[in-house]
Amino acid sequence: MKSWILSCVIVLTTIFNTSFANAAPDLEVNTPAISAIKNSMQARHPSLAPHYASGAVGLTNNGLIAVHDASAVPLKERQSINAVVSAENADRSALYKEIASGNGHPEWEAGIRDAFASRWIDKAQPGWWYQTKDGWAKK
């Protein structure tokens, strides 16, 4: 009887551990909050695109963006681009948090951020700058 119970416990433990270990976030989950954030980011993208192309702004390896080459932005526009970068980063951080919450696992936020960091870099256009663990690189 003890060995039967022990066998059942082992089987159940294996089943539950496997299902939790194999759980992966749904990066396409959608909620009203996620939709609002994505809309905000899409509306901002046209103002960022020329700065990605010029190398002024690059994609970081932590899922955000950063001013990569401030000299590529005229002095009178630098404050403006810094504000746009800050707004984009706030939305990106909120997006990762909302996707984790939408999956019912707020603790997944860091992994979701990492997944998106790779996604953004993979989708970057030729000529855009992105950050690696060793520094900046041009796609």
Pin down the residues of each PLM region.
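Amphipathic, charged alpha-helical segments and their helix-to-coil junctions
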Residues: 23-78, 83, 102-139
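Sec/Tat signal peptide C-region and signal peptidase I cleavage site
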Residues: 17-23
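Positively charged n-region of N-terminal signal peptides that target proteins for export
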Residues: 1-4
